[in-house]
Amino acid sequence: MKSMNIAASSELVSRLSSHRRVVALGDTDFTDVAAVVITAADSRSGILALLKRTGFHLPVFLYSEHAVELPAGVTAVINGNEQQWLELESAACQYEENLLPPFYDTLTQYVEMANSTFACPGHQHGAFFKKHPAGRHFYDFFGENVFRADMCNADVKLGDLLIHEGSAKDAQKFAAKVFHADKTYFVLNGTSAANKVVTNALLTRGDLVLFDRNNHKSNHHGALIQAGATPVYLEASRNPFGFIGGIDAHCFNEEYLRQQIRDVAPEKAELPRSFRLAIIQLGTYDGTVYNARQVIDTVGHLCDYILFDSAWVGYEQFIPMMADSSPLLLELNENDPGIFVTQSVHKQQAGFSQTSQIHKKDNHIRGQARFCPHKRLNNAFMLHASTSPFYPLFAALDVNAKIHEGESGRRLWAECVELGIESRKAILARCKLFRPFIPPVVDGKLWQDYPTSVLASDRRFFSFEPGAKWHGFEGYAADQYFVDPCKLLLTTPGINAETGEYSDFGVPATILAHYLRENGIVPEKCDLNSILFLLTPAESHEKLAQLVEMLAQFEQHIEDDSPLAEVLPSVYNKYPVRYRDYTLRQLCQEMHDLYVSFDVKDLQKAMFRQQSFPSVVMNPQDAHSAYIRGEVELVRIRDAEGRIAAEGALPYPPGVLCVVPGEVWGGAVQRYFLALEEGVNLLPGFSPELQGVYSETDADGMKRLYGYVLK
């Protein structure tokens, strides 16, 4: 590894004797230094507090030619003699040796060995790629180290990622300590796989699973299709803007749940623990965060285990006002359920795409019949893991844990929360049409008038007060949910927040999203009159200021009714005949009117309400088996009413199934997809990604949606 720098007071830079590069204190963020040298004056200027706040635990030396008392936070006093330079170098070396987490440290050392290999992968450290011009370009683009770190598990020096030995095991133990789990498993093919690992380890045919209707499709795949478990669905909320909300409070009532069990498995209705597993979204895609303590206290005694799908959170325990939502920080006893938490590290933590982790917290039920031992979980783990893992992915998970260790993780997320608050304030100051999704008034005072430090430390500034008009969610209890401060959620015109009804004019969020992408800004997702931007410690003031500026510019285009060719040139140039002479407001009005004509906001809401759920006539596993056997036919969604779905269907994002295999097409779900079909034809260039239904062009040139149903 390249030697790290030493940071020093500017007056000391030229006086330090070291083979390392010496940089001034003002020229570093301290991520590239292994030791710090300050003067007595520096020690009184606040630098020691700054260094402590980083959480990096850097060795700090005070340079003084006179005897001085050793300040707190200083390793030693030096005056420049040769022995003391050696002490400085020794401290820097020790810092470097302890800096890297277990697996990544071993990986870097192994790469430096430059072994000659006759094992997989066949590109042999990139040499194969370099034998062709395209391969050479590929190699140069990614850089040497990624190819050298892509190696075979034939050499045991790096440990085993499947049976968890060596430095791989050490890395996962380290992550478990950082995240307060009993065990942690690194997953290299996303939380879609992580959820399947957990559900395949716990569920079998005939088991009952308490199932959040908001769950990501991977939970349907693992629990219902692969394991064949029987779901008891929990209805969830959608608001008029299109945001995904939480489960209704009444769904956590024991008698209500036992009645639901009587409808699907009466023989299990009176069992002490009727559910083998409950699967709950700890945080929804749109930033509704649950109180984990409430969930466990209300339904935990009915469940052997609870899986908190935390794909869209995972950082909550590092943010004090979110800590109550973390299942991993809870004190649990032998009467509580076992806990699994799956996290998409790549979403808002520091990980390559596809990096995920499973946290297991169940030592409190060890020895009970319901306990899931490591060997059983690992059996499911190996069902879904590749025997040819990409080591840089595993290393990224290891480094992510190191980044979050101790004060470092808390500081990084505190800065993220504060930056998000400042950005919301800037939007409120600059924009008239786009509004941050937060309570407009708290205790009679405008949200933005509170100091940022106050907003960042008190959850009530992000809480969903039951019945409050601003959020439009129904069925919530007090202190049940709050807005994730690290999800910048905006609403667009089109909904009267006081009534929840459509206004005369609207700006569908997909049009704003297209404009932002045209101008180099990529939002996470949008739906109806809502748009989402993910915030992480990677953000900067400059980056978010650019976003605010683009929002203000788009508002000006709305006010000026600018030509569409000027605002969305890519869409206009692709469909010049359809959008000839269109203005921006004209496009907004047509799309808004389409939403109104189908009442899309209410269709979307109804799909996740129990009274509108599609009828269940088959176990999802049986319906899927019929699909695999070819006992299906492809029909137009328009003609699918009353037919049994062979595939789950959904728009992506968010990846939440609207109809599940074995359910009957009809009602709100069918009308919702017909509304999407109408939009595909009426407004080309704004088609959503649909899965489980298929767009085909008919003889009349119109696109029609089809789906597989059982014969």
Which stretches of residues belong to each language-model region?
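Non-catalytic terminal extensions of PLP-dependent enzymes
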Residues: 2-4, 12-19, 28-40, 45, ...
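Conserved N-terminal alpha-helix of the aminotransferase class I/II PLP-enzyme fold
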Residues: 144-193
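Conserved acidic residues
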Residues: 31-36, 73-82, 182, 207, ...
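Short amphipathic alpha-helical segments embedded in low-complexity Lys/Glu-rich regions
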Residues: 190-193, 238-241, 530-532, 567-568
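Short strand->helix junction
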Residues: 23, 192, 285-286, 540
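A short linear hydrophobic-aromatic micro-motif
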Residues: 184-185, 342, 520-524
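Conserved PLP-enzyme active-site core in the AAT-like
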Residues: 39, 48-52, 56-57, 193-204, ...
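Short active-site oxyanion
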Residues: 2-4, 182-184, 206-209
